[in-house]
Amino acid sequence: MNILGIDYGDSKIGLALSSGSYSSPLTVISHVGYKKKLAELIKEKFVEIIVIGLPLSMSGKYSNSSLKAIAFAEKIKKMTGLPVFMVDERLSSVFANTIMKLSGTKKAMEDAVSAADILDRYIRNPSMGYEIKGRLQGCKVEPDQLFNHAVLLYNPPSPLIDGIEKIDCRALDIYCEHPQVYLHLKSKGFLPKNLRDELDFSCYDIIVIDKNTGRSIFKNFSGSFSLLQCP
């Protein structure tokens, strides 16, 4: 199975390829005409999966660079129809610089070396990848249950949440890990958090969860739970 790794930057896009247990730097392309170049490469190399780096701050927070990379991943998903995953790319550039110094690789290939590191991370542990969906499923909350409460919407599986705009609560926080969900909630004007360390569960009256979330993870929480209705 051929997997394409991508390190997305503001001006350049690093590419790497794997057909087995390790990856190799491939090339670096510019943003100009990247869709055509990628389409040709994907066809030529018989690519079946695409892995894109997710830039995060060192603490793990999402940033403007994160949002750009997520939007790019959605474009690639729409363009190719292939399975697309994102993985944490923190320190990939540091790794690339180290490898280049040791191997004498040209500076121009730095982004491709970073892409290879991103790809290797996915190959070592595919479960760490966030899959980018072509079509998002909808969920639903019951606004009346949340009236005048301090509410935490915890890790919704989709940003398409019917009733979220009608919630009239005392306070609303949203925690989400998935980059695509984060991007769309942010674009709707919400300010989601993506670090559990930022949460104090004792501050909330109600935590809204989906059916797959275990309740034992919420330490020091004495309030009630509401179920997010998802397909």
Question: At which residue positions do the language-model features occur?
Answer:
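Histidine-anchored nucleotide/phosphate-binding helix
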Residues: 158-167
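Phosphate- and other anionic-substrate recognition elements at nucleic-acid/protein interfaces
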Residues: 2-6, 10-145, 168-205, 209-215, ...
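Conserved class I S-adenosyl-L-methionine
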Residues: 148-159
